[in-house]
Amino acid sequence: MSKKKDPRVTRIEDLAGPKSPGELEEMKMPYEEYCRQAFDPGNEAKKPESLKGIRWLSCTMYIFTPHSAANLAELGAEVIKIEIPRMGDAMRHTSPFNEAYLYPLHESRPMTGTGLGFTNANINELYLTMDYHIPEMVDVFYGLVKMSDGLTELYRPGTLDKWKMSYKYLQEINPRFIYVWGGGFGYGPKVFGGSYDILGQAHAGLASITGMHEYMGGHATKCTNWVIDWASGTIITYGVLAAIHWRRKTGLGTMLEVSQVQTPTRFMGYSVPLYGRFGIVRQRWGNWDTQLCAHGIILCGKSDYPDADNPQEKFDARYVMVSAFNDPDFQELCSVIGRKDLWDNYPRHKQRLEAEAQIEVYDALEQWAADKTRTEVSDALNNAGILAYNVKNHREVYESEHLRQRGTIRWLDDPLFGDLLTHCTYSTGLMSKSPRRLKWQWRPVGADNVKIYRDMLGIPVSQVEDWYEKAWI
Amino acid sequence: MAQEKRDVEINSIQDSLDMLTPEIRPWPVTPPPSAEEVSTQVYTKRKAEDFLGWVEDNVKFEKSFGKAEALAGLKVLDIGLWRLGHKFAASMLAEAGAEVVCIEPPGGDPLRQLTPFGREEYMLADQETGEKCGIEFIAEMVNQYAITLDVDTEEGQQVFRELAANADVVIEALPPGYADERGIGYRHLKDLNPGLIYAWTGIRGQWGPDKDRLSKHGQWEIEPFACASNAWIHSTGYPQDQLPRGKGGDPTRAGVWIADYVAGEQVAVNIMAALYWREEFSGEGQFIEVTGAEALMDITDFDMTWYGFNKSIKARTGAWDPNLNQYEWNPCKDGYMMIGGQSDRLWYRIGMCIERDYPQFGRLIHEDPYLKEMGARNALHALIKTYTLTTRWLRDINRVQAEEALLEYEIAAGPVLFVDEVCEFPHFKYRPWIYNCESDYGTFLYPTSPNAYQFDTPHRLKWVGRRLGKDNGEIYSKWVGYGPTRLAELKTEGVI
Amino acid sequence: MCDVIWCKKEVDGSPCETVNYLDPFCFWNWEGTINCAECRTVYYIHMIQGHMYKGPEERPGEEPDTSPLYADKPLEGYRNYMFATEGRTRPFECMPRSFLLGEADMVKFSIRGKPVRGWRPQPESAGIAGSFPYHWDIQNLSPDVWEEYQEKIRKGEVSDW
């Protein structure tokens, strides 16, 4: 509530508007310019880091749990990734169609590279190798625990417990410790079931509602990328940050048990409650929307780039997202495509949202688009004031002036691997004062062994070399 | 329990509606296994009963309500329409204990009116007033208070400033510059409340040459616009080589508004990071902007890096992953079966499992010299061969049989489940990943927060959506000290 | 014989012995004619839910509706026909480039012409216990690539985007 004012005094802070020439400038600035200056893409390194001083251990593999720790590293935490000696994370051995690798994977393997499948999941981290099985390593591991704020692991249930590295033991060593066990299923009947992103999509229901309906000829469709792995990893990061907030007040750590397979169910909007109340099982509805019409992706007759060499451009630059669900927009749409009868038949949103009406509406749109290119279609609609947007491919994303200006597509001069195009980190959100940043993509397996074993834990170099020879690290 | 039986003739949905209630068709249909059964039949198999018993004792969902809340005392305002990103972020904060107030215009968020295929019979009625609301809106307003405010009026803007002066966090999801033009944007609020963390979220951005637009008639851009603008749709779906174009072989959107969820969780993460920075170091709030297009682009694996490497444009590959073999789902007798296992150890175990029923698999796959090396197995022709023969095995068995067979070999495998099967899957019921909450709209089946299983501060669901303006009295009184008379005035003026 | 057509057609006195793979999503429910990738014999098949309801029946003289994507010959060391072998296998259009390598692409420069460590072998550069510095000393480690880079700069083949 505003404070009671003394009516006899006029204070500058009570007057509306800016209070100094600097503020005056700021308030006069067009809003876009104001945002651009506030976020100042490209100068993140000059600003402070949000999570300065937090140190995290990432005993992880694949995408789900690594991403949960990488999020912290992007925000300024020091994250130590612990990998299997020589081999490293299994994800290093994945690459699209076996074609894209950066070299070397490890000092001893000049002919083996890290596949691009590893990209973005472990950025800014320090790379340590350690074989947890070796009894001599347990105390070393405890040393790391005492010096860290928390840990994320993904091992099968009880694995780290067997080696006395579970939260049961670590909370005694470091009561402030925050421990994350990120599994596929977590406790319960399927606790030993392994999991992957694609398993989450399948098992949790997302696949059953993605893709073309059977009558359109479609099958249950996988959302591209390992989207559920990544998204579940971010859920962990959030849980960790909330726990850190709580720890600021109480000084106490906690343990989180997070299941990757669960996340997609939480992303399914009305699906579960609709089933619970009415027994209705939501089905696939292809490129259309179950709650809005017209609001869908249509196929146009011609590609924008019929002569391109890349088949993705030649054959697939043919899809447009069209949206006109509000009455005036839909009316306008019908008039642009010369089908005023559709507006006469379906003047209310509820009417055009019925399945049969949707089929008719999108058929009409595709018929109208049959002799046009993708851009002819989107231009015609945009010029009429209707929302339409080309379904873009990666070249178009690369060439997007918008993303370049916002710094969410940029080139990284990686300290060890050179020139890498990057679409991560900055794209998770612009922050005006303590932004995320990308320092390096990844480092070879064990690249920071000396830095951590000697410089941090004080283990003599001769000892480190001995362990290395024995492949303990 | 004895079940009453009766004959019913169903000619239209109307004939079945009154039977589709949880009272007549309960959830779960069969009870989950007991803790005792799980411990003795599952955990002991691998001598994990002690450890998992300890885990269950400490993180079990049923114990979450007696525990502390991590964000207790944090005050959050959420204002926006139509989309789910800001609502998901607000729900995440509220699940961890923050006091989250959702502001709607006096007419309500249009999302309240959305219902699948326009079916009003699937909207739920508030038990006190009978007001109907769409399920998606109710589901995405976890633990939030519902108040109304018209920020298009000058008075409403003043009220908003007073609310924000008292808040730790504002989440805004209005069109670009909308709040700023009304004097309630970040640059106005930061002076009133220097500790304020202000997060804007939208589709492509509030600034830049391709920022969010409205149509000529004022219609908003809604998901999947974000997925269209970052090549995500371009690379989702079946190739035209597997299914004909126009009949399933096209770029495909997600069934849900996925970029909203992905942006929403990063809004929550960035807010928490900004909060840490405020509390630990600076005492200052800051300005955050998260878009669906970019937050989703962040998690498109290596896609853009690959383009920068050798101009590859990621093509869609249907239900097969181009980076790992095996890692896919294929059709089987009663649906689709997902199988994963890439390393030699797992890959050959899958083969051993299939070979038992279909010896030719072992011969054609394991003898083939081109399939011996892990990386080489990811080549497209290797996928075609492996998956054709895997499906030859799957076509004769159903999902449960395949799952049991593969789990015996410790292979990550799972069926593509439909929503009813998800809700009835024993593991999901046991944890439970879905459970019934008693809401203002009656029994409401709900997916649990993945952060609900913790020693000390589990996130939890206390209530779901509320009717429009239900909490005006409580929140305006607590946050800005307005009594009933003042609220009545504001109501008359159309401000709330 | 289902999901694969193991062609036993007599060709020059011996059976063809080619395995033609019928990829599952395309052929799960499908009816029509398809050729053997090796001997080009045309078969009629009718697939329902992955089962071959009818066929394969030879249809001499007919043009095939489609071809397999991949075929191989187990008795000849798995000699194979890749997709898009003209007249034998079906093209596969939905690819990231107009061609696929199926093996690691040796890349020294990014698409804007700056060096990237995408080739092997890399000269040794690690320190104790597999440690690496935070700096790619390309001038000393790979002087030939550095020289090539200088040449690219001179030719204007390096750009900001």
Task: Give the location of each predicted region.
Chain A
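Substrate-binding/catalytic subdomain of NAD(P)-dependent oxidoreductase enzymes
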Residues: 243-286, 394
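A glycine-rich dinucleotide-binding beta-alpha-beta segment and adjacent secondary-structure elements
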Residues: 384-439
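Short Gly/Pro-enriched turn/cap motifs at secondary-structure boundaries
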Residues: 109-111, 118, 282-290, 296-297, ...
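Glycine-rich beta-alpha junction loops
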Residues: 86, 184-186, 260-265, 302-304, ...
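An anion-binding loop in the catalytic cleft
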Residues: 43, 302-303, 313-318, 374-375, ...
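A short glycine-threonine-serine/GTX helix/turn-capping micro-motif
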Residues: 220-231, 255, 286, 293-295, ...
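Aromatic-enriched alpha-helical interface/lid elements that frame and gate functional surfaces
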Residues: 294-384, 388
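N-terminal helix-loop segment corresponding to the beta1-alpha1 unit
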Residues: 2-252, 450-473
